[in-house]
A protein has these predicted regions:
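N-terminal leader/signal peptides at the extreme start of proteins
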Residues: 1-7
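Sec-dependent N-terminal signal peptides of Gram-positive bacterial secreted proteins and lipoproteins
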Residues: 7-26
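Surface-exposed, hydrophilic segments of mature proteins
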Residues: 2, 29-254
Length: 254
């Protein structure tokens, strides 16, 4: 129940009332018939009106966001073929509408392209585009046996542009006039030269069995401190909630 309370998004502006005990007699008029209305404002993280500009992915483009999505892949082509030694365009990017509240943004990547037990050297991977994104410590896998390096296979990543601390996410600051975007987590998936068709998950009539790399986005409204303390309490709470979300997501797809 506590986690559900933390996850519930809302900005509540509550007026704290200071009640003064007044004497009777000539001072009674000071409190007679007084009342104060407490105004509650519901937070918003709406879908942007436009898809991101493919050439300037932190800016809105010209294409309408008809599907009301918050997660975009402007360069992905359905049915893209995997060729060993080549790359496949895939560029996940998260956006929020003008006038939304600031938010912390996370992306979880699930890689189910090759069969379970396939060696890491045969597993498709990606590298981060820039420092707008960081891996969440202890929550990612690389294609190295010791989990080192920057060729990522799967895991949880956080938006980190100008973050206040190395290990914490940064706010995606909303703009009152235009949609804003995180920039792309990565731009392509590399298909290892060592991979062959017998390594790939066999396609069946069940789409859940198809070779896929699935990207999920988690957007957590800023200002929710939870039980955390300190100047970066809301960032720490967002990170903790994202880890729970990613773990639930991973377990639900096993």
């Amino acid at each position: 129940m506590e986690n559900k309370k933390k996850k519930r998004y809302g900005i509540i502006a509550a007026l704290l009332l200071l009640v003064l005990a007044a004497g009777v007699g000539t001072y009674a008029w000071l409190t007679a018939q007084e009342h104060i209305d407490n105004v509650f404002t519901v937070g918003r993280i709406d879908a942007p009106d436009k898809k991101p500009d493919p050439s300037k992915p932190e800016q809105p483009g010209d294409s309408d966001n008809d599907s009301h999505a918050r997660l975009f892949e402007t360069n992905w082509k359905d049915g893209s073929k995997m060729v060993p030694g080549a790359t496949v365009a895939k560029n996940p990017n998260v956006g929020i509408k003008a006038g939304s509240d600031d938010a912390y943004v996370f992306i979880y990547v699930k890689n189910a392209i090759v069969k379970p037990g396939t060696s890491l050297e045969k597993t498709p991977y990606f590298t981060l585009k820039n420092t707008n994104w960081k891996p969440v410590e202890g929550q990612v896998k690389t294609n190295q046996s010791d989990n080192s390096g920057n060729q990522y296979v799967s895991g949880l990543f956080m938006y980190s542009k100008n973050s206040a601390a190395q290990s914490l996410p940064a706010k995606l600051t909303a703009n009152a006039q235009q949609d804003v975007y995180t920039d792309e987590l990565f731009t392509a998936v590399t298909i290892p030269s060592a991979m062959n068709n017998t390594d790939v998950v066999e396609t069946t009539t069940d789409p859940k069995q198809a070779p896929t790399m699935t990207v999920y986005a988690y957007i957590f409204g800023a200002g929710q401190n939870g039980t955390e303390q300190g100047s970066n309490a809301d960032a720490q709470n967002a990170l903790n909630q994202a880890k729970i979300w990613a773990n639930d997501l991973e377990n639900s797809h096993k």
